[in-house]
Amino acid sequence: MKIKTGARILALSALTTMMFSASALAKIEEGKLVIWINGDKGYNGLAEVGKKFEKDTGIKVSVEHPDKLEEKFPQVAATGDGPDIIFWAHDRFGAYAQSGLLAEITPDKAFQDKLYPFTWDAVRYNGKLIAYPVAVEALSLIYNKDLVPNPPKTWEEIPALDKALKAKGKSALMFNLQEPYFTWPLIAADGGYAFKFENGKYDVKNVGVDSAGAKAGLTFLVDLIKNKHMNADTDYSIAEAAFNKGETAMTINGPWAWSNIDKSKVNYGVTLLPTFKGKPSKPFVGVLSAGINAASPNKELAKEFLENYLMTDPGLEAVNNDKPLGAVAVKSFQEKLEKDPRIAATMANAQKGEIMPNIPQMSAFWYAVRTAVINAASARQTVDAALKDAQGRITK
């Protein structure tokens, strides 16, 4: 193994020398890796992985976390500039790939097998792999162990639980009803879907927003509101405050919410989202991914860094120790992280969920479904009319 690594590093050094002499005009510096990652992620940990890479190869790695990098990247990459590697949630990468800004990646089968298969689906665009999946985010049911030691397994149990808790001055469940990202798991459980995914691509005309299953899910949500088990005006901050003050027994949120709950000292657990009609809730799954700039002259170096330095147990551990990654795509490191039941639950919900489509048409989906849920929840429209309108807006 050591000989192989040594040979690989020699080959990379030779490649770098060749690249230096090849083109002095490229905007992206050759023989150096520049990485962009968001400021809320473990960029110091990533820089440590970069130091190890530099020590082994002599190639300097610079980790930057510019503001609004997801908007800056397409602007600079279109002119042949920007970072060699960009980290962001996978759903932005479809538009980048459509504009020709990301290099196709070609990991071998042995490397692909190290990751959970569903994570590769997140970084496929028109049948090609356009990034490496790194970490996995999905909503889970978060519950107050002192109020509900055994959280409900089904949505159908929630009205009776709420009745019992109301008698004690509490409520069963509060979560953000203003954003479809949070309401979608229930709407999708019985067969709703955003865009049909077939043969490695999305069919933008095959939308499941006004399917029978979506109507059943939204009708159940509207009934919870009509029967005063939930309030149509609940948004993210209202739900978070109610849970963290111990006023409501459960909420639906992701790993980013855990640190505030930790500070609130609520005795909480994270578990599977409830089933609806016997079927699992289907949260949208976001995958933090690493793409390689199509304009980079350092594509082989970027591949070496990502596959053999970052996407290893020690590499991911360095980033995770800086800022928790949540669940991860690499099986061996996920198995270590799953000792934390919160992370095991995140991955279990993700595996039952729906990969967030990485296509530009998602902006129309978010807008239309948001309006539909708000209108149905506030009784401005019937469920059928609201979802029919949404379907029309998305497919027009």
From Swiss-Prot:
<comment type="subunit">
    <text>The complex is composed of two ATP-binding proteins (MalK), two transmembrane proteins (MalG and MalF) and a solute-binding protein (MalE).</text>
</comment>
<feature type="signal peptide">
    <location>
        <begin position="1"/>
        <end position="26"/>
    </location>
</feature>
<keyword id="KW-0574">Periplasm</keyword>
<dbReference type="Pfam" id="PF01547">
    <property type="entry name" value="SBP_bac_1"/>
</dbReference>
<keyword id="KW-0813">Transport</keyword>
<keyword id="KW-0762">Sugar transport</keyword>
<dbReference type="GO" id="GO:0030288">
    <property type="term" value="C:outer membrane-bounded periplasmic space"/>
</dbReference>
<dbReference type="GO" id="GO:1901982">
    <property type="term" value="F:maltose binding"/>
</dbReference>
<dbReference type="InterPro" id="IPR006059">
    <property type="entry name" value="SBP"/>
</dbReference>
<comment type="function">
    <text>Part of the ABC transporter complex MalEFGK involved in maltose/maltodextrin import. Binds maltose and higher maltodextrins.</text>
</comment>
<dbReference type="GO" id="GO:0015144">
    <property type="term" value="F:carbohydrate transmembrane transporter activity"/>
</dbReference>
<dbReference type="GO" id="GO:0042956">
    <property type="term" value="P:maltodextrin transmembrane transport"/>
</dbReference>
<comment type="similarity">
    <text>Belongs to the bacterial solute-binding protein 1 family.</text>
</comment>
<protein>
    <recommendedName>
        <fullName>Maltose/maltodextrin-binding periplasmic protein</fullName>
    </recommendedName>
</protein>
<dbReference type="GO" id="GO:0015768">
    <property type="term" value="P:maltose transport"/>
</dbReference>
<keyword id="KW-0732">Signal</keyword>
<dbReference type="GO" id="GO:0055052">
    <property type="term" value="C:ATP-binding cassette (ABC) transporter complex, substrate-binding subunit-containing"/>
</dbReference>
<dbReference type="InterPro" id="IPR006060">
    <property type="entry name" value="Maltose/Cyclodextrin-bd"/>
</dbReference>
<dbReference type="InterPro" id="IPR006061">
    <property type="entry name" value="SBP_1_CS"/>
</dbReference>
